[in-house]
Amino acid sequence: MMKIVIYHSNECDPKRCTSIKLQKQNKVAITHNMRKIPYNAIVLDAEADKAVSREDREKITKYGLSALDCSWKKLKKSSFNFKSKKNHRLLPFLVAANPVNYGKPCILSSAEALSAALYIVGYKDEARDLMNSFKWGPHFITLNENLLEAYSEAKNSTEIVEVQNEFLGGK
């Protein structure tokens, strides 16, 4: 599997933290040092301007995928420190299946976000493998399957946004 590195800000409940669980299963690496995030990795960032898409697959394969694990309530403050990396990507509209934010649009756990990004770029088996680490995990894929499939067929960020807007009733 490609390299997945999570910058962990220690703002969440360790017992419920999806990143810590994935690390215990050797599926991701956790760092508390920004410099440990691979330089050209795709960085999932809820404040990014560009959506993750199939065109990011090569970079993820070569350099890895990274995410910021922080409290949604402290996102602005935590993500400010995260801005030094360059390949920031936003996830399109998806619905959370984790027990903390179940049914909430766009408020995904780190594991859900990583899984969604992998699915969208075409690493569907790897996405399912991450979600299989949680009792509720497979339901995330099922709940969002139509959207994830449509997003994975989009060629680039622009098409991802078009799929999202069509789903949400926009143009």
Swiss-Prot record:
Superkingdom, natural source: Archaea
Which residues does the annotation say bind S-adenosyl-L-methionine? 18, 68, 91, 110
Q: Name one GO biological process term.
A: enzyme-directed rRNA pseudouridine synthesis
| EC number(s) recorded for this UniProt protein | 2.5.1.157
Q: Can you state which reaction this protein catalyses?
A: an N(1)-methylpseudouridine in rRNA + S-adenosyl-L-methionine = N(1)-methyl-N(3)-[(3S)-3-amino-3-carboxypropyl]pseudouridine in rRNA + S-methyl-5'-thioadenosine + H(+)
Q: Where in or outside the cell?
A: Cytoplasm
Keywords carried by this UniProt record:
Cytoplasm, Ribosome biogenesis, rRNA processing, S-adenosyl-L-methionine, Transferase
Gene Ontology MF terms: 18S rRNA aminocarboxypropyltransferase activity; S-adenosyl-L-methionine binding
* Keyword S-adenosyl-L-methionine included in the entry's annotation: yes
Pfam families in the cross-refs = Fer4_RLI (PF04068), Ribo_biogen_C (PF04034)
Q: Which GO cellular component terms, listed alphabetically, does the Swiss-Prot or TrEMBL entry include?
A: cytoplasm
Q: Main subcellular localization, coarse class?
A: cytoplasm
Q: What does this protein do?
A: Aminocarboxypropyltransferase that catalyzes the aminocarboxypropyl transfer on pseudouridine corresponding to position 914 in M.jannaschii 16S rRNA. It constitutes the last step in biosynthesis of the hypermodified N1-methyl-N3-(3-amino-3-carboxypropyl) pseudouridine (m1acp3-Psi).
Q: What family is this?
A: Belongs to the TDD superfamily. TSR3 family.
NCBIfam families reported for this sequence: PRK02287.1
Protein name, UniProt field = 16S rRNA aminocarboxypropyltransferase
